[in-house]
Every structure is written in C-alpha cells, then in structure tokens.
Curated annotation (Swiss-Prot):
Its cofactor is Ca(2+); Zn(2+). This is Thermostable neutral protease NprT. Transmembrane segments: none annotated. The gene is nprT. SUPFAM superfamilies: Metalloproteases ('zincins'), catalytic domain. It is an enzyme of class 3 (hydrolase). Optimum pH is about 7. It comes from Geobacillus stearothermophilus (Bacillus stearothermophilus). GO terms for cellular component: extracellular region. Thermostable. Retains about 80% of its activity after treatment of 65 degrees Celsius for 30 minutes.
Amino acid sequence: MNKRAMLGAIGLAFGLLAAPIGASAKGESIVWNEQWKTPSFVSGSLLNGGEQALEELVYQYVDRENGTFRLGGRARDRLALIGKQTDELGHTVMRFEQRHHGIPVYGTMLAAHVKDGELIALSGSLIPNLDGQPRLKKAKTVTVQQAEAIAEQDVTETVTKERPTTENGERTRLVIYPTDGTARLAYEVNVRFLTPVPGNWVYIIDATDGAILNKFNQIDSRQPGGGQPVAGASTVGVGRGVLGDQKYINTTYSSYYGYYYLQDNTRGSGIFTYDGRNRTVLPGSLWTDGDNQFTASYDAAAVDAHYYAGVVYDYYKNVHGRLSYDGSNAAIRSTVHYGRGYNNAFWNGSQMVYGDGDGQTFLPFSGGIDVVGHELTHAVTDYTAGLVYQNESGAINEAMSDIFGTLVEFYANRNPDWEIGEDIYTPGVAGDALRSMSDPAKYGDPDHYSKRYTGTQDNGGVHTNSGIINKAAYLLSQGGVHYGVSVNGIGRDKMGKIFYRALVYYLTPTSNFSQLRAACVQAAADLYGSTSQEVNSVKQAFNAVGVY
C-alpha cells in the first residue's frame, strides 16, 4: 500500500499496446496484440461443437484459425488444459497454458468460454512461431543453482545491501520468456525474504548466458501459512479499533487454556488473527485475551484486522457468491504489529501482514477497511487472473484491489467514499488519502491513458496507472462527463459485478488495458445482454479514459 512503490523494474516482455476492437469477416469481435500480431480477445459465435469434449472446441478453433494464431503446430500439442469450471451463468470456463516442447511459455494463458455447446469467447495472448525463434535453438548452459545464485546476489547488491534470509528457499522453473519480439529459454526464479526488508522478487535469468532479463518485486506469491487453531467454543467479544470505534468480534474460548482467541469459526475455514510482537517472523502468536474484552490500545490493530477480514469474507460471499479468496473457503490469516513502525501492508500468498505505521505518515494499516479489502482482493486476483505485478497488468491488479476495497467499504457502510486509505494515511492532515477513484489527479495520478506513466519505477507504474482504471470504474458506477465523453452511470452493484466477472473469468496474467476493456464489455453482455445500457456504459467509461 505504498503511495509510490520505490522499486524499479525492467519492462515486461509482452507488448502492452492493443488495437481497437474490430470485427472479422465472420462477425467476430477481435482485439489484437500489436507486438505479436495475434488476437488477445475474440468473441462471437466462434464454433459449435455438438457432443464432443469442450476442450476439443478450443483446439479445433485455434487449428482452424492457425493463420491468425500461428502456433506452428497442432493446438493440442501447444495448449495444455490446466483448469475447468462452470460459472454462475452456466458457462464452462477453461484455462490453457501455452507450452513449447513441454516448457511453459511465461505469462501466457488462454481463457475459453463455452455456452450451450458453443465456443463464444477466447481471451489471452499467445506467442506465435516459437519454432522459428533462433534464440530457442541455443543450448542451456546455466544450471538451476547458478540462476538462483545470480538472483540472490543481485537482490543483495541492489535491494537489501546484505544477504537476505530467504524463506523456503527459491522456487525456480524453466520457461520460454518472450521479450522484445523474440523468445528465450530462461529460468523464472522466485526469491522470498522478510529481513532486512520484506521482499518477494521474481527474476528472469537467461538459461544460455545468465543475463538478468527482468526482475520485479511481487509480494503475493504462494508460501505456507503457520499457526495452529485452538479447540473451543465460539463466542462473541467486544473491542475497540484503531479509530476508537467499538466492534463486536467472533472469538473462540478454550477451556483448556482458559483464554479467548481471535479465531472466528463462523466463516469458512476460519478467520485467525496473530500478534507479530513487532518482529518479522510470521505468523506470530494467535491473539489471546483473558476476558473477551479487546479494548487495550495494543489490541486495536488486531480488532480491526479480525473484524474487517470478516466483512471482506461476507462481501465476496453475499455479493459474488465467492467463498473466501480462493473460492473454496480457505482460512483467512492476518498478522498485526509486524516490525516496528512498518509503513506497509501486504498479502504474502498465504496471509495478510499489517504494519503499525510510524504514527505520522500512517496509522496501523488494519484500521482502514478499504485497505483490508484492497489487500485481500490481491489474494482473489492471485487465485483467478494471476495478473503479473508489473506494467499494465500490474496496474489492473492494483485497480481491482482499489475497486473492491472501496466496494467493501460501501458494503459495510462505514463512512464510505471513493478515496483509498483515507482512514489511516497522514492522521494529522484532514481530507488526505493515498489515491482517489473519483479524481485520480487529486493525488498526482493519471485519469486518462494519454497521461499514463511510461517509466520503470513502481514496477512500471502499477500504483500510478491504476488511476486510469479507477476513474473508468468510478464513471461506470456514478456517471459523469470526462474529457468531453458522457457516461451514463449504472450504480456500484452492477459496476462491481462486471469487474468481478472480468477478473475471475476473462483476464489472464499479462492482460493489458485494452484487454480489460474487452473483458468488461463481454462481462456486461453476459450479465445484462449485448445490447444493454450496461454494455454501452462500459464502452463510454473506457472511452472517457482513452482506453480502446
């Protein structure tokens, strides 16, 4: 939740420009990836398959359109089915990973939608003509151990200034990495650590010469959670939050230990809140109290983290039918009092982590309901689109968290507004916030694609360019005139349903802004009809911020 991320990053491999939506001779709506000259979103009546397996529809369509996709071989040999589900509208949604001789192609995924036996949409970019890539013919000369050593040494020299204590070792896999119109054999190395500063770095190391092709910090990759639940009776305690407001919270009483614990057994697999005790070891100790009265000042951050995690769970369940962040009722774990004066909050892949702030720039981060909603939405994104935390896909990742963090705030009706982090940012300055969805320029963020940040700081502007999508979401909900474009608002509820459907069922790891527009248009058509006002409003909202 930094106002500006301080870490730079090399540009992501995928071309982020896409041509405006067009129509093929067959009546299909197509968005093109400008760099690779391949479709990144196709919708329409693509192919009817009768009684055959649904994945065969996708293989047949891609093979039929081989002149467009140019995979250089049979689709079934190049696309591996990695997931299949039925959504709320009865569509079958399948996700495929592109592979080359069995090696995954970094960042590629194809999401396919089948309705009543007919293929109606494909989203995601594929890399063409890999057989003709000369760099892929070079022999692998770098070992896994050497790649990991290169990444850790670079972290030491450029990030931590001392050798970090890594967690669970490094995770490394061999990939095909597309970059600058070419593709290379590379290692994807994940280096995770909590000290001396938290980091979750992704490195792309050329497997033929050891060069660092890309690197970025992404604090949301998988790592195991810790801490054990207690057996006992569900109870209701009372506490005071960071802002001094009283809250009733679900707790557990253990007669064996004689304590009350911040363990909520009423939601999914439980909500657990831990005391980090100003250290940097996770998860810490399950929060305890002797009388079920969590009213001490030290309790405040834990009270809010626990209570607001329950609100976020309820929002996703009651509004979107989603059971916890993974859709399967995963336990929600939060640690407060992480480090000393730590000015951040993050999702680490298995749990939430909240710093106390320094008291001047930030209050304890769990005191902002939109902050809690924001960070837990990163977990939802982690389990759905998996948006790469860099450049436009990273800005979409951040915008989704802002959008749903704000919608959670409205759901709870706790002084809701369109500002982000206003409750915990600069407590001595009235009316200040981290970002604004209604007026991104208020805090120096762009509100139109023509004003986007194009540098490498902040992972390519993930916290900056999110303002463009935030403004589109605000306009879609509330309506208005922006840069001379009139938008008819459809309300928060419909806006949220459209963005949720786009996130969960259409976006893929390297989706850019144009693909997000296409995904939202298709989501609105799915929900409200292709000729509906909602579809028109989505188009108006993205037109208003210059995204086509």
